[in-house]
Amino acid sequence: MNIYIGWLFKLIPLIMGLICIALGGFVLESSGQSEYFVAGHVLISLAAICLALFTTAFIIISQLTRGVNTFYNTLFPIIGYAGSIITMIWGWALLAGNDVMADEFVAGHVIFGVGMIAACVSTVAASSGHFLLIPKNAAGSKSDGTPVQAYSSLIGNCLIAVPVLLTLLGFIWSITLLRSADITPHYVAGHVLLGLTAICACLIGLVATIVHQTRNTFSTKEHWLWCYWVIFLGSITVLQGIYVLVSSDASARLAPGIILICLGMICYSIFSKVWLLALVWRRTCSLANRIPMIPVFTCLFCLFLASFLAEMAQTDMGYFIPSRVLVGLGAVCFTLFSIVSILEAGSAKK
């Protein structure tokens, strides 16, 4: 990979993170209304995902340009995990007060969910520490065995366990909230947290794919399994969002319904990464360099929809939160474009 292109792909996640923080701060300073509180806090929290994606980009690009660096393989996942833990603590702090307001309740749950995603993405960074083994293993055969440089089976299973456990936590928590969906804050927080949990579940497939390909244990059975898994979760999340929008006339349905649809777009962006790794595993795919266009389209979908919603929010404040949050989700999708491009450069056969 060209060193200048490498730096561009490293900078994209940081720039997108700064945009989320800047827009979130601007929204918070604009008004003290509850809609501004929720949108501003959620936007700022999305920077944690961008930070985690930056650590992933840095680790892989460094290997492509300079080879494996043990120090980077340790430092950058720690940075990503630190950002995710801080985000989860921030979300929990909003929920820990004695008299939690509705806006704090919703924002706290969403921010905690964003922190969970950041932790899963940081696990992608941690599992990518020996990314160069993937094209090497793909050029060989399963009979070659596990390379001595690869993670042990125990470490690999521990890495996969991180998104699995966070997915279970998010699913149980969101279902608990939805059991009292007659309470509006529970209804909103439960649906959005369930969508965030779907993203964590998608990242199970990505981490498992990277770990198994690195260890040369990527089986024929799971070759397309994770692709189906991620596309299924993305589609279910989009359908859930549509259901929320059409199942009621209450304005409270607008934010979770619209945001769920765009969380599905993030799932599709993750699908592009899982699909790419599956396509180039022990085969040649002439269209592999087109796959990075998927997160570009999902990014544009989020941003264009946000622009329409911003106009609608002038007359109906129910559209205000999604019109702002979707900008941050679009930034995350564009950050995923840089990651998919890096994976394509590192793993596709030219």
UniProtKB/Swiss-Prot annotation:
The keyword Cell inner membrane applies. Its main location: membrane. The chain crosses the membrane at residues 3-23, 42-62, 75-95, 105-125, 158-178, 191-211, 226-246, 258-278, 291-311, 325-345. GO terms for cellular component: plasma membrane. It is a multi-pass membrane protein. Residues 1-2, 63-74, 126-157, 212-225, 279-290, 346-350 are cytoplasmic. One of its GO terms (biological process) is cellular response to acidic pH. Keywords: Cell inner membrane, Cell membrane, Membrane, Transmembrane, Transmembrane helix. It is found in: Cell inner membrane. It comes from the Bacteria. Residues 24-41, 96-104, 179-190, 247-257, 312-324 are periplasmic. This is Inner membrane protein YhiM. It comes from Escherichia coli (strain K12). The lineage of its organism: Bacteria, Pseudomonadati, Pseudomonadota, Gammaproteobacteria, Enterobacterales. The gene is yhiM.
